[in-house]
UniProtKB/Swiss-Prot annotation:
Function: May play a role in preadipocyte differentiation and adipogenesis.
InterPro entries with a match to the protein in the record: AAMDC, MTH938-like_sf, NDUFAF3/AAMDC
Stretches the record annotates as MTH138-like domain: 6-122
Record-annotated membrane-spanning stretches: none
Name by which UniProt lists this protein: Mth938 domain-containing protein
């Protein structure tokens, strides 16, 4: 199953191809997407994205996982999260969210089994 493209991105709003929902923050993987609710794992801008935040997407069999740190890159990504993914053989790309969406969509177009977690505000 292919990863859905990110159809649109603006401050505080993301749309994923194949979904009628608008997300503030979202997780995407081959065949699906959902809201990324930081309250589930106690995520805050610092220390940032934890392994628990990316575990669900990593378990979907992705080759690459793209992390969008926000429009102003306020969301941190500690080395422990990158190491968690790399130990599973997953290529990790950590970028400002607009750049992350471009990278993610380019990987989708190449047929890569890509997933992502994206923060669409600060």
């Amino acid at each position: 199953m292919a990863s859905p493209k990110i159809a649109s991105l603006s401050w505080g709003q993301m749309k994923v191809q194949g979904s009628t929902l608008t997300y503030k923050d979202c997780k995407v993987w081959p065949g699906g997407s959902r809201a990324w609710d930081w309250r589930e794992t106690g995520t805050e801008h610092s220390p940032g994205v934890q392994p628990a935040d990316v575990k669900e997407v990593a378990e979907k069999g992705v080759q690459t996982l793209v992390i969008g740190r926000g429009m102003s890159e306020a969301l941190k990504v500690p080395p422990s999260t990158v190491e968690y993914l790399e130990k599973q053989g997953i290529d990790v790309r950590v970028l400002q969210t607009e750049q992350a969406v471009k990278e993610y969509n380019a990987l989708v177009a190449q047929g890569v089994r890509v997933g992502g977690v994206f923060h669409s505000t600060c």
